[in-house]
């Protein structure tokens, strides 16, 4: 079964990109590498990140322990994907990341918004809006609480850290399987940028551009945008359309305020959108129920799992809007580093899937519409003593509101389909039920448009304090102790309505 996971070669052709510091360069390459390049001189202010020095290129700095340390000094099982590898492997989003990170698997389910991240075989949460995923995803230190907020194309990425195994001490309740931490590039005090335009098979078109530079001696900016589209590679014979397409894009703006070497404030705002027909499936086995589908005029692609063909009576649509802003302040107070991160994230999604996966109208609607608003704040203090003992302490606040609604209804052919599978028992049951509920019109049991309609209102508040102590006992041997306390409160209200004509029948009172 294929749930929208595209072959690795889709849209991977004819790409070129250039990035400069101190110059602005643009290169576009299409059709076997025909390209043009434009460069112009650019002024540069004095501030330059130490990480850009040539002498530091072989040192890998990670923040897996919420402190900047070398990979060798980080006592956590972590895989680091560098900027160079991301560009060379053409990693566009978190789905592509599994191709270069061992033990990470990304499973796209019945919609783009339902994507499971699995580390070492553990992961959950994509299909239940009331459950947070057990693999936490952080982008620039901001927690993305739902998979719909995690799947947009990755922005200008500096590195990606994948922490394997439980990380609850520093990251709280939603990190029992691991962490994916995406670190993007800060604005630079030198004018520069990059642009990329690529074209591949299935009419894949990817466009990305970024510009960064100084506004003044203390303020720098960056603006970035991306667009990613590709024709679907699964042909729907019933609808004469291609499914499992890509159609997504986004914009991102940053400001970096750095009045001194001891303080900096980084502001980020972003918006991305997904509007795709996804996720088609192909049949592995034409089972005994296939004859019932064909009797209703439906079509099944028999036993051709590699043909990339399907047949449904309406396309499965996915519309996701993901947006937010964050602020991070860092202050060097001598022997202590102080960090504050505050953020708001919003997600609006609407999906509808033909979940019977046939061209017969069995399922009329299987839809979900969610509005998710998430507020987070984190403050931490890390020591920098010269002695053998150092510590990190912090506090985290989480507040989330979710308004969710959905519908699962019968299609036009469901009644006859159920009757065919049950040898007529399904429709013959209706007279008995009508006798128990006088006045019920005939022919409505399992009728078109009937089903279940649900609305949920979730609220989640959590406060946690955490900390760790590192004791350098002897050279090359450090003992780390950590702890976390979390108070988590969830409330919800629900309204579920079943419109089937016999849903109000009390079979117990009726003596059945």
Can you say where each PLM-predicted feature lies in the sequence?
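Outer-membrane beta-barrel transmembrane strands
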Residues: 147, 248-250, 256-258, 268, ...
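Acidic, small-polar-rich N-terminal luminal/periplasmic segments of exported/outer-membrane proteins
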Residues: 55-190
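Periplasmic-side early beta-strands and strand-to-turn transitions of outer-membrane beta-barrels
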Residues: 181, 188-190, 198, 210-305, ...
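N-terminal Sec signal peptide and the immediately downstream disordered periplasmic leader
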Residues: 2-89, 95-101, 212, 261-262, ...
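Outer-membrane beta-barrel translocator/receptor signature
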Residues: 115, 132-134, 146, 155-158, ...
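Structural signature of outer-membrane beta-barrel domains
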Residues: 67-69, 115, 124, 200-202, ...
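Hydrophobic packing within well-folded, soluble alpha/beta domains
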Residues: 86, 98, 160, 180-182, ...
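Signature of Gram-negative outer-membrane beta-barrel scaffolds
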Residues: 237-242, 392, 399-512
């Amino acid at each position: 079964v294929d749930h929208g996971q595209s072959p690795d070669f889709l849209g991977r052709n004819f790409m070129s990109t250039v990035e400069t510091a101190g110059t602005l360069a643009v290169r576009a390459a299409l059709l076997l590498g025909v390209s043009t390049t434009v460069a112009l001189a650019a002024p540069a202010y004095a501030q330059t990140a130490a990480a850009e020095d040539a002498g530091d290129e072989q040192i890998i700095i990670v923040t897996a322990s919420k402190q900047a340390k070398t990979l060798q000094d980080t006592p956590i099982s972590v895989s680091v994907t560098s900027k160079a590898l991301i560009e060379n492997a053409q990693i566009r989003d978190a789905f592509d990341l599994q191709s270069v990170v061992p033990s990470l698997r990304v499973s796209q389910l019945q919609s783009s918004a339902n994507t499971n991240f699995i580390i070492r075989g553990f992961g959950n949460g994509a299909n239940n809006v009331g459950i947070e995923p057990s693999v936490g995803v952080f982008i620039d230190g901001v927690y993305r609480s739902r998979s719909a907020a995690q799947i947009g194309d990755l922005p200008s990425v500096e590195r990606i850290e994948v922490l394997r195994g439980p990380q609850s001490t520093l990251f709280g309740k939603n990190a029992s399987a691991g962490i994916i931490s995406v670190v993007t590039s800060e604005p630079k005090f030198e004018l520069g940028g990059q642009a990329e335009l690529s074209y591949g098979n299935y009419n894949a078109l990817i466009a990305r551009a970024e510009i960064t530079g100084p506004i003044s001696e203390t303020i720098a900016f960056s603006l970035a945008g991306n667009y990613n589209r590709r024709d679907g590679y699964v042909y729907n014979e019933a609808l004469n359309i291609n499914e499992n397409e890509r159609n997504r894009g986004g914009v991102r703006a940053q400001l970096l305020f750095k009045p001194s070497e001891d303080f900096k404030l980084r502001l980020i705002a972003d918006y991305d959108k997904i509007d795709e027909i996804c996720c088609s499936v192909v049949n592995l086995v034409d089972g005994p129920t296939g004859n019932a589908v064909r009797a209703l005029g439906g079509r099944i692609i028999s036993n051709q799992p590699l043909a990339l063909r399907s047949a449904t009576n309406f396309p499965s649509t996915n519309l996701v809007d993901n947006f937010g802003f964050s602020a991070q302040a860092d202050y060097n107070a001598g022997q202590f580093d102080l960090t504050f991160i505050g953020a708001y994230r919003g997600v609006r999604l609407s999906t509808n899937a033909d979940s019977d996966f046939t061209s017969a109208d069995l399922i009329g609607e299987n839809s979900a519409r969610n509005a998710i608003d998430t507020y987070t704040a984190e403050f931490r203090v890390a020591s920098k003593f010269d002695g053998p003992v150092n510590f990190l302490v912090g506090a985290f606040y989480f507040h989330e509101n979710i308004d969710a609604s959905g519908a699962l209804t019968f299609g036009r052919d469901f009644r006859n389909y159920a009757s065919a599978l049950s040898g007529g028992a399904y429709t013959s049951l209706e007279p008995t039920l009508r006798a128990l509920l006088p006045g019920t019109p005939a022919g409505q049991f399992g009728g078109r448009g009937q089903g279940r309609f649900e609305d949920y209102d979730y609220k989640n508040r959590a406060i946690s304090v955490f900390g760790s102590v590192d004791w350098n006992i002897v050279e090359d041997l450090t003992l780390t102790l950590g702890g976390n306390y979390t108070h988590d409160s969830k409330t919800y209200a629900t309204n579920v309505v079943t419109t089937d004509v016999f849903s109000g029948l009390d079979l117990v009172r009726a003596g059945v």
